[in-house]
């Protein structure tokens, strides 16, 4: 299957994926320590760099070297947190991935089933329309086998009111007499 099957259910809320912000919120709730400590490590790194910059401007090389070492420690803490969190939550991530794949498979199957139901309904409507159309054609053919009088009445009614000649009581009596003969 190269592309998904088209359906009118494409815009349905049930088949929508989560937004990146929702995904971030869900991941933050699942693994709260990794981003929190990682953010703390980033803040400590920025603070150490800022202090090193101020020490360099002031000409205090001892404080500057100390802050550069603190920056390295903060970056190490950040990296260690990310790696440890990745190892700790690896099994949960694989389980979550398997669950998402099963969910995606189920959604795809539901979408396909809904599409097939929709096609069946359209096919049924099409068959009903064809049957109705065939019945109308059959009725029209039967109506075509009637005597010429029906054609005359149809031609008479097709005339505009301004084009019709005056048809009075005497003319109606003459028509009745001529039809009987």
Swiss-Prot record:
Main location: mitochondrion
Gene3D superfamilies: 6.10.140.1320
Boundaries of every HIG1 domain copy: 5-100
Transmembrane parts of this sequence: 33-50, 70-89
GO BP term (any one): mitochondrial respirasome assembly
GO (cellular component) term, any one: mitochondrial membrane
Pfam families listed in its UniProt record: HIG_1_N
Similarity annotation: Belongs to the RCF1 family.
Protein name per UniProt: Respiratory supercomplex factor 1, mitochondrial
């Amino acid at each position: 299957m190269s592309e998904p099957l088209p359906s009118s259910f494409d815009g349905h809320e049930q088949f929508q994926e989560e937004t990146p912000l929702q995904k971030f919120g869900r991941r933050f709730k699942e693994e709260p320590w990794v981003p929190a400590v990682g953010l703390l490590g980033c803040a400590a790194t920025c603070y150490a760099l800022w202090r090193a910059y101020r020490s360099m401007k002031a000409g205090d090389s001892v404080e500057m070297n100390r802050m550069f070492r603190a920056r390295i420690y903060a970056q190490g803490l950040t990296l260690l947190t990310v790696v440890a969190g990745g190892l700790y939550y690896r099994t949960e991530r694989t389980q979550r991935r398997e669950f998402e794949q099963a969910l995606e498979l189920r959604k795809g199957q539901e979408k396909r089933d809904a599409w097939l139901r929709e096609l069946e309904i359209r096919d049924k409507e099409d068959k009903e329309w064809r049957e109705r159309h065939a019945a109308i054609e059959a009725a029209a053919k039967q109506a075509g086998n009637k005597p010429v009088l029906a054609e005359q009445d149809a031609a008479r009614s097709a005339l505009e009111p301004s084009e019709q000649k005056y048809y009075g009581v005497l003319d109606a009596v003459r028509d009745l007499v001529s039809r009987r003969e």
